[in-house]
Amino acid sequence: MVPRLKEKYEKEVIPALMEKFQYKNIMEVPKLEKIVINMGVGEAKENQKVLESAVADMQLISGQKPILTRAKKSVANFKIRENMPIGCKVTLRKNKMFEFADKLMNVALPRVRDFRGVSSKSFDGRGNYALGIKEQLIFPEVEYDKIDKVRGMDVIFVTNAKTDEEARELLRFLGMPFAQ
Protein backbone atom coordinates (compact mmCIF):
# COMPACT_ATOMS: atom_id res chain seq x y z
CA MET A 1 0.00 0.00 0.00
CA VAL A 2 1.31 3.44 -0.92
CA PRO A 3 1.73 5.77 2.09
CA ARG A 4 -0.70 8.70 2.20
CA LEU A 5 2.04 11.31 2.15
CA LYS A 6 3.81 9.72 -0.83
CA GLU A 7 0.56 9.80 -2.80
CA LYS A 8 0.07 13.45 -1.84
CA TYR A 9 3.64 14.20 -2.96
CA GLU A 10 3.13 12.58 -6.35
CA LYS A 11 -0.36 13.97 -7.04
CA GLU A 12 -0.28 17.46 -5.46
CA VAL A 13 3.20 18.55 -4.37
CA ILE A 14 5.11 17.84 -7.61
CA PRO A 15 2.69 19.85 -9.82
CA ALA A 16 2.58 22.71 -7.26
CA LEU A 17 6.39 22.93 -7.05
CA MET A 18 6.78 22.70 -10.84
CA GLU A 19 4.43 25.65 -11.22
CA LYS A 20 5.99 27.72 -8.43
CA PHE A 21 9.66 27.27 -9.42
CA GLN A 22 9.09 26.92 -13.20
CA TYR A 23 10.86 23.57 -13.50
CA LYS A 24 11.01 22.23 -17.05
CA ASN A 25 11.59 18.60 -16.07
CA ILE A 26 9.83 16.55 -13.38
CA MET A 27 13.22 15.25 -12.20
CA GLU A 28 14.22 18.77 -11.12
CA VAL A 29 11.53 18.82 -8.43
CA PRO A 30 13.09 18.46 -4.97
CA LYS A 31 12.20 15.34 -3.03
CA LEU A 32 12.67 13.97 0.45
CA GLU A 33 15.73 11.70 0.39
CA LYS A 34 15.76 10.41 3.97
CA ILE A 35 14.86 11.24 7.56
CA VAL A 36 17.48 10.70 10.26
CA ILE A 37 16.32 10.46 13.88
CA ASN A 38 19.10 10.84 16.42
CA MET A 39 18.94 10.50 20.20
CA GLY A 40 21.98 11.42 22.26
CA VAL A 41 21.94 9.68 25.63
CA GLY A 42 24.49 11.34 27.91
CA GLU A 43 23.74 9.11 30.92
CA ALA A 44 24.71 6.00 28.93
CA LYS A 45 28.30 6.33 30.17
CA GLU A 46 27.28 5.35 33.73
CA ASN A 47 24.31 3.13 33.01
CA GLN A 48 23.83 0.88 29.97
CA LYS A 49 20.16 0.27 30.85
CA VAL A 50 19.37 3.89 29.97
CA LEU A 51 20.67 3.34 26.45
CA GLU A 52 18.65 0.13 26.09
CA SER A 53 15.42 1.92 26.97
CA ALA A 54 16.28 4.76 24.56
CA VAL A 55 16.82 2.19 21.80
CA ALA A 56 13.47 0.54 22.65
CA ASP A 57 11.66 3.92 22.54
CA MET A 58 13.22 4.81 19.21
CA GLN A 59 12.34 1.42 17.76
CA LEU A 60 8.69 1.96 18.74
CA ILE A 61 8.65 5.45 17.23
CA SER A 62 10.41 4.66 13.95
CA GLY A 63 9.42 1.04 13.35
CA GLN A 64 13.05 0.19 12.64
CA LYS A 65 15.93 -1.01 14.85
CA PRO A 66 18.30 1.87 15.67
CA ILE A 67 22.08 1.60 15.51
CA LEU A 68 24.23 2.69 18.45
CA THR A 69 26.32 5.80 17.94
CA ARG A 70 29.72 5.80 19.60
CA ALA A 71 32.05 8.54 20.82
CA LYS A 72 34.52 9.56 18.12
CA LYS A 73 37.19 10.53 20.61
CA SER A 74 37.81 10.62 24.36
CA VAL A 75 36.79 13.77 26.25
CA ALA A 76 37.88 13.91 29.89
CA ASN A 77 35.40 16.65 30.88
CA PHE A 78 32.45 14.55 29.71
CA LYS A 79 34.00 11.39 31.20
CA ILE A 80 33.72 9.54 27.89
CA ARG A 81 36.24 7.34 26.15
CA GLU A 82 36.64 6.69 22.47
CA ASN A 83 34.18 4.13 21.09
CA MET A 84 31.82 4.26 24.11
CA PRO A 85 28.15 4.00 23.07
CA ILE A 86 26.55 7.42 23.73
CA GLY A 87 23.34 7.40 21.69
CA CYS A 88 21.39 5.84 18.86
CA LYS A 89 20.09 6.81 15.44
CA VAL A 90 17.78 5.58 12.71
CA THR A 91 17.82 6.43 9.01
CA LEU A 92 14.42 6.10 7.34
CA ARG A 93 14.02 5.96 3.57
CA LYS A 94 11.24 5.25 1.04
CA ASN A 95 7.86 4.20 2.46
CA LYS A 96 8.90 4.15 6.14
CA MET A 97 10.19 7.70 5.72
CA PHE A 98 6.85 8.93 4.32
CA GLU A 99 4.89 7.09 7.04
CA PHE A 100 7.05 8.62 9.79
CA ALA A 101 6.82 12.14 8.28
CA ASP A 102 3.03 11.81 8.03
CA LYS A 103 2.79 10.65 11.66
CA LEU A 104 5.13 13.41 12.85
CA MET A 105 3.33 16.26 11.05
CA ASN A 106 -0.28 15.16 11.60
CA VAL A 107 -0.25 13.33 14.94
CA ALA A 108 2.87 14.00 17.02
CA LEU A 109 3.57 17.74 16.54
CA PRO A 110 -0.04 18.83 17.26
CA ARG A 111 0.28 17.01 20.62
CA VAL A 112 3.16 19.27 21.74
CA ARG A 113 2.14 21.63 24.55
CA ASP A 114 1.64 25.28 23.43
CA PHE A 115 2.45 24.32 19.84
CA ARG A 116 2.55 27.30 17.50
CA GLY A 117 4.38 25.72 14.57
CA VAL A 118 7.99 24.73 13.93
CA SER A 119 10.71 27.30 13.23
CA SER A 120 11.33 28.04 9.58
CA LYS A 121 14.91 29.12 10.34
CA SER A 122 16.34 25.63 10.96
CA PHE A 123 17.53 25.05 7.39
CA ASP A 124 21.24 24.43 6.87
CA GLY A 125 21.81 26.30 3.60
CA ARG A 126 21.76 23.13 1.50
CA GLY A 127 18.08 22.30 1.65
CA ASN A 128 18.07 20.13 4.78
CA TYR A 129 15.82 20.80 7.76
CA ALA A 130 16.57 19.91 11.38
CA LEU A 131 13.96 19.77 14.11
CA GLY A 132 14.43 19.17 17.83
CA ILE A 133 11.80 17.31 19.83
CA LYS A 134 11.90 17.75 23.61
CA GLU A 135 10.01 14.63 24.65
CA GLN A 136 9.27 11.25 23.11
CA LEU A 137 5.77 11.24 24.65
CA ILE A 138 4.25 13.15 21.73
CA PHE A 139 4.33 9.95 19.67
CA PRO A 140 1.24 7.76 20.10
CA GLU A 141 3.30 4.52 20.29
CA VAL A 142 5.13 5.56 23.46
CA GLU A 143 3.10 4.83 26.59
CA TYR A 144 3.48 7.25 29.49
CA ASP A 145 3.66 4.50 32.14
CA LYS A 146 6.34 2.49 30.36
CA ILE A 147 9.03 5.17 30.04
CA ASP A 148 11.77 5.67 32.62
CA LYS A 149 12.77 9.20 31.61
CA VAL A 150 11.64 11.92 29.22
CA ARG A 151 14.10 12.09 26.34
CA GLY A 152 14.39 14.38 23.36
CA MET A 153 15.61 13.68 19.86
CA ASP A 154 16.69 15.39 16.67
CA VAL A 155 14.83 14.76 13.42
CA ILE A 156 16.65 15.75 10.23
CA PHE A 157 14.82 15.92 6.90
CA VAL A 158 17.37 15.47 4.11
CA THR A 159 16.14 16.69 0.72
CA ASN A 160 17.83 16.99 -2.64
CA ALA A 161 16.69 20.61 -2.96
CA LYS A 162 19.37 23.05 -4.09
CA THR A 163 18.24 25.95 -1.90
CA ASP A 164 16.55 26.40 1.47
CA GLU A 165 13.64 28.15 -0.24
CA GLU A 166 12.91 25.07 -2.37
CA ALA A 167 13.18 22.76 0.64
CA ARG A 168 10.90 25.02 2.71
CA GLU A 169 8.22 24.95 0.01
CA LEU A 170 8.56 21.17 -0.36
CA LEU A 171 8.03 20.62 3.37
CA ARG A 172 5.23 23.21 3.50
CA PHE A 173 3.34 21.48 0.68
CA LEU A 174 3.85 18.13 2.43
CA GLY A 175 2.14 19.60 5.52
CA MET A 176 4.94 20.74 7.85
CA PRO A 177 3.33 23.26 10.25
CA PHE A 178 5.78 26.20 10.02
CA ALA A 179 5.24 29.11 12.44
CA GLN A 180 4.04 32.28 10.74
UniProtKB/Swiss-Prot annotation:
Highest taxon of the lineage: Bacteria
Q: Which family does it belong to?
A: Belongs to the universal ribosomal protein uL5 family.
> Would you tell me the protein name for this molecule?
Large ribosomal subunit protein uL5
Pfam families (alphabetical) = Ribosomal_L5 (PF00281), Ribosomal_L5_C (PF00673)
Spell out the molecular function terms from Gene Ontology: rRNA binding; structural constituent of ribosome; tRNA binding
NAD as a keyword of this entry, yes or no, is no
The UniProt entry, under PANTHER family, shows: 60S RIBOSOMAL PROTEIN L11-RELATED
Job of this protein: This is one of the proteins that bind and probably mediate the attachment of the 5S RNA into the large ribosomal subunit, where it forms part of the central protuberance. In the 70S ribosome it contacts protein S13 of the 30S subunit (bridge B1b), connecting the 2 subunits; this bridge is implicated in subunit movement. Contacts the P site tRNA; the 5S rRNA and some of its associated proteins might help stabilize positioning of ribosome-bound tRNAs.
Identify one Gene Ontology CC term for this UniProt entry: ribonucleoprotein complex
Organism of derivation? Clostridium acetobutylicum (strain ATCC 824 / DSM 792 / JCM 1419 / IAM 19013 / LMG 5710 / NBRC 13948 / NRRL B-527 / VKM B-1787 / 2291 / W)
